[in-house]
Amino acid sequence: MDHSIVLKSYGKINLGLDVLRRREDGYHEVRMIMQTVGLYDVLTMKKRKDDKIEMTCNLSFLPTDERNLVYKAVKLIKDKYHIKDGVEINLSKRIPVAAGMAGGSSNCAAALKGMNQLFDLGLSIDELCEIGVTLGADVPYCIWGGTALSEGIGEKLSRVDAMPDCYILIAKPGISVSTAFVYKNLDLPALSKHPDIDGMLECLKEKDLTGICNRLENVLETVTIKEYPIIEKVKKHLCLLYTSPSP
C-alpha cells in the first residue's frame, strides 16, 4: 500500500485557436492547434487501505474535493471499475491557474493515467480519452500531449507535425480569466478575421519557426483584451523587447 507513483502534468499553449460556431447544446465548435510546453505540475498518487479519496494541494485556494477534476477522475475510475482501495493524492501546482494552459485538464489526464497504472487496468490511450472527454473537452488532448489539431468541441484530435524545439516565454498577468465567461461573450458574427490554421499546419510541416510565430492567433482575445486591457499592454511590451536593439 505504500507504493506511490509520480506523474508530470504538462501545461499547453494554443498556437492557433479559431471558433467556428456555437452549437445548439451550448458548446462551441473549435479548430485549434495545441502544443505541450515544458512547464508542469506534479501529481503523486498511492493506494490507501480504506476506500477513501484524500487529496492535498500546495495551493490552499484550490478545492480538493468533488469540485476538483483530479478528484472527479479518481472517483470515476474507482466507480467504473469497482475499485475497493482508496487513493491518496498530492498535487503540486506550478502551471498558472485560470491562464488558458489547461492546468486542470492536464491534472485530470494525469490522474486518469495514474489510476490506470496504479491499479493495472490496462486501458489504452483511446479508452482513456473516451473517459476523459466526459470530464472536460481538453482532457483527451492532455492525455495525448505533443502537437495536435483539435476539432469539434476539442474531442476530435489529429496528430500533426511537431513544433521545432524552441524557448517559449510565458507571461501571466495577475488576473484570472474564466473560460466560460470568454465563450459566453464571444461575438462570432462580429469577427472579421480568423486565425490561419491551415497556414500554421503548413509552417509546422516545414519547421518554419518564423512562419509559426507570425501566425500565432487566438479569437478569444477579442473578448479577453477588451475585458482585461493588461493583456494587450503585456503583448505590446514583449514586442518592444523583441524589436529593441542589443546594447
Q: What label would you give each PLM region?
A:
Residues 1-99, 117, 121-126, 163, ...:
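ATP-binding N-lobe of GHMP and related small-molecule kinases
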Residues 2-8, 12, 16-18, 22-32, ...:
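ATP-dependent small-molecule kinase catalytic core of the GHMP/sugar-kinase superfamily
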Residues 51-57, 111, 208-216:
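Short, basic/glycine-rich phosphate-binding loops at helix/coil junctions
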Residues 70-73, 111, 234:
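Generic structural signal for hydrophobic residues
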Residues 242-247:
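Conserved small/polar residues in nucleotide/adenosyl-binding loops
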Residues 107:
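Conserved cofactor-binding/catalytic machinery of classical short-chain dehydrogenase/reductase
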